[in-house]
Amino acid sequence: DQDFCGRFSEMNPDADIIVVFGGTNDHGHGDAPMGTEADRTPDTFIGACHFLFSRLPNQFPGAIIVVLTPLHRMGENIPKGESGWLLRDYVRVIRDTAAFYGLPLLDLFETSVIRANDPEIAAKLTTDGLHPNDLGHEILAGEIGDFLKGLAE
């Protein structure tokens, strides 16, 4: 169980596309503090985003690197950590940090139809209010595929 910062250097160096899709576990049960905009080490969530997003282009110079925000989930408005951060706070950090490094961002929090914070949608498209079921994965694959096709045009 290693975080993104600890495992990205072990990925295939010949990868054509790198997709960073994280943040929901940090909100749900992560133990790293949020940190400040000045942080650049993996010791805080903000620092880890800067650490990862600044290093990926150097580690994978020929790859397309894209960042996805978390999907909506059940419990997203339950404050987490000492500071009471909500999922949307983690989403904001991911958006802002991807923009800082000029990385393409698919804002699934804003655009995806998989809004598991709605109990009806959660029952139809997820297994547990977070993880997509087969239909949810089909929808998510289409959303990501359309985004990647748009980058290639």
Predicted regions and their residues:
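Alpha-helical cap/lid subdomain in secreted, periplasmic
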Residues: 3-153
